[in-house]
Amino acid sequence: SDQILAYSAHFDHIGSTDKSGDNIYNGADDNASGVTLMIGISDYFKSTEPAFSMMYMAFNGEEKGMKGSKAIAENHLLKDKHAKISALFNFEMVATVSQFGPNALYMTGAEFSDLDELLNANAAAGLKVHPDPYIGQQLFYRSDNVSFVKKKIIAHSFSTVDMNVAKHYHQLNDDINVVNFDNLTGLINSFGKTFQKLTPENFTPQYNDKVSFK
């Protein structure tokens, strides 16, 4: 297909401290989990041909102001590819079971497009996408998706982390012990089966007039 579904995640984190002992910010949830979900989806489609073409992007520099995604979004050599993206799915902190339960995520900026509605209408294997419950934190404008929003591309981030209670966000304890592997595996399979159902005919997400492209 000429139309593209794009998937992304940032692979950088915030580095280390000068303290002795365990001083490395591993970033298992933020954002090795998102990269894992993206790679898992690509692996799903190794043996299954989707109706859309697919693009996978791993960004550096998110923690420094979304530098990697900005560079790709503004690269004029990719302008023709960008014009064909029907939607970009950015995965950000998906290591835990969300407050909505297993196999469920929230989508930032749900009030700005019908992407979540279309996903839920085509959802497979129990996948459920909820509106962002932390809307006051402006998460839609704080992750790599916003670099593509500024180009008027449908782009949202998908997450499971509970921003009200998470104690590992940008902390040294964001390590492998945070990861719920069963849930992450379930998300990979559910997203794969859901994306497999999408076609350029049944999946045409649109922004509404509430979104800001600035």
Protein language model features and the residues they cover:
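Catalytic-core environment of secreted peptidases
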Residues: 1-57, 77
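Extracytoplasmic/secreted envelope proteins and their assembly/folding machinery
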Residues: 8, 35, 39-42, 66-73, ...
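Short acidic/His/Gly/Ser-rich catalytic and metal-binding motifs that mark active-site loops
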Residues: 13-19, 97-100, 164-169
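Soluble non-cytosolic domains of exported or imported proteins
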Residues: 25-36, 48, 63-67, 109-113, ...
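Sec-exported extracytoplasmic/periplasmic mature domains
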Residues: 40-50, 74-78, 120, 124-127, ...
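His/Asp/Glu-rich mid-to-C-terminal helical/loop segments that flank catalytic regions of hydrolases
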Residues: 43, 160, 165-214
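Acidic/histidine-enriched alpha-helical segments
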Residues: 51-59, 88-91, 204-214
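Metal-dependent peptidase/peptidase-like ectodomains
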Residues: 59-163
